[in-house]
Amino acid sequence: MFNTALLLAQASPTTAGWSLSVGIIMCLCNVFAFVIGYFAIQKTGKGKDLALPQLASKKTFGLPELLATMSFGHILGAGMVLGLASSGIL
């Protein structure tokens, strides 16, 4: 019997290997997600604060907000890399 996960892994196309362009896409997606999250998250400052200087506004951007935006950025980046690799651009 074949494992279903093994069959799905074999059916998926090969993805792009690590390169400078993949790293740049991931960094840009994370910065984009950070900017979106900074303005979209309404209730900030509920968790631990970061040991970094805050932006000029009175909004505190803590560790939970950073983890949320970076997780979203990695999801966006993985989707961008997979989409660009499958279309042949990357």
UniProtKB/Swiss-Prot annotation:
<keyword id="KW-1133">Transmembrane helix</keyword>
<keyword id="KW-0603">Photosystem I</keyword>
<keyword id="KW-0472">Membrane</keyword>
<protein>
    <recommendedName>
        <fullName>Photosystem I reaction center subunit PsaK 2</fullName>
    </recommendedName>
</protein>
<keyword id="KW-0602">Photosynthesis</keyword>
<dbReference type="InterPro" id="IPR035982">
    <property type="entry name" value="PSI_centre_PsaK_sf"/>
</dbReference>
<feature type="transmembrane region" description="Helical">
    <location>
        <begin position="20"/>
        <end position="42"/>
    </location>
</feature>
<comment type="similarity">
    <text>Belongs to the PsaG/PsaK family.</text>
</comment>
<dbReference type="InterPro" id="IPR037101">
    <property type="entry name" value="PSI_PsaK_bact"/>
</dbReference>
<dbReference type="GO" id="GO:0015979">
    <property type="term" value="P:photosynthesis"/>
</dbReference>
<dbReference type="InterPro" id="IPR000549">
    <property type="entry name" value="PSI_PsaG/PsaK"/>
</dbReference>
<dbReference type="GO" id="GO:0031676">
    <property type="term" value="C:plasma membrane-derived thylakoid membrane"/>
</dbReference>
<feature type="transmembrane region" description="Helical">
    <location>
        <begin position="67"/>
        <end position="89"/>
    </location>
</feature>
<keyword id="KW-0812">Transmembrane</keyword>
<dbReference type="Pfam" id="PF01241">
    <property type="entry name" value="PSI_PSAK"/>
</dbReference>
<keyword id="KW-0793">Thylakoid</keyword>
<dbReference type="GO" id="GO:0009522">
    <property type="term" value="C:photosystem I"/>
</dbReference>
<dbReference type="InterPro" id="IPR017492">
    <property type="entry name" value="PSI_PsaK"/>
</dbReference>
